[in-house]
């Protein structure tokens, strides 16, 4: 009986110690994880629509990234900052011209907003898509012309 408990405890300790190793196992190679989602930074310059199509082609259920809570925002900020420091990054938020509200491309609810001060400003009445800004260390949003080219973040 004592040996069974010892072996069981040993296996339990081993399982917990390995749980942090390979934390991105459920994500394909080149992707990183947060909770149940996988993300990939794309080092191509594309318009918002081109970036969205790329994400859809890259992975089944792929979209430009939605950001639904502060923890996700901080994780993405940390990961993007490891790769880039002066480049804004497209995310999956855009202004619905029909409804005049901001919507995530994946259909999830906009539960929080993280606009930079003075944003969204719809400069020249042409800014309907959103980037994470490098000057905020990728924590804040700015509306941009959807036809501008930026690097981007995919999610599935």
UniProtKB/Swiss-Prot annotation:
The keyword Metal-binding applies. Pfam families: Lectin_C (PF00059). Expressed by the venom gland. A motif (Mannose-binding) lies at residues 119-121. Keywords: Calcium, Disulfide bond, Glycoprotein, Lectin, Metal-binding, Secreted, Signal. Residues 1-23 form the signal peptide. SMART domains: CLECT. Transmembrane segments: none annotated. It is found in: Secreted. Residues 34-155 form the C-type lectin domain. Disulfide bonds join 27-38, 55-154, 129-146. Its main location: secreted. One of its GO terms (molecular function) is metal ion binding. Glycans are attached at residues 35, 109. Gene3D superfamilies: Mannose-Binding Protein A, subunit A. GO terms for cellular component: extracellular region. Belongs to the true venom lectin family. Mannose-binding lectin which recognizes specific carbohydrate structures and agglutinates a variety of animal cells by binding to cell-surface glycoproteins and glycolipids. May be a calcium-dependent lectin. This is C-type lectin lectoxin-Phi1. It comes from Philodryas olfersii. The lineage of its organism: Eukaryota, Metazoa, Chordata, Craniata, Vertebrata.
């Amino acid at each position: 009986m004592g040996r069974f408990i010892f072996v069981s405890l040993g296996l339990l300790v081993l399982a917990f110690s390995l749980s942090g190793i390979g934390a991105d196992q459920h994500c394909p190679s080149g992707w990183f994880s947060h909770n149940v989602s996988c993300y990939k930074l794309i080092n191509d310059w594309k318009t918002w629509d081109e970036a969205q199509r790329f994400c859809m082609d890259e992975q089944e259920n792929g979209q430009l990234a939605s950001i639904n809570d502060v923890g996700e925002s901080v994780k993405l900020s940390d990961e993007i900052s490891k790769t880039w420091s002066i480049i804004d990054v497209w995310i999956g938020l855009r202004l619905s011209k029909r409804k005049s509200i901001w919507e995530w491309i994946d259909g999830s609810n906009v539960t929080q907003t993280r606009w930079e001060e003075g944003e969204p400003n719809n400069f020249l009445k042409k800014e309907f898509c959103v980037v994470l800004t490098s000057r905020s260390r990728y924590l804040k949003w700015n509306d941009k012309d959807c036809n501008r080219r930026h690097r981007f973040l995919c999610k599935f």
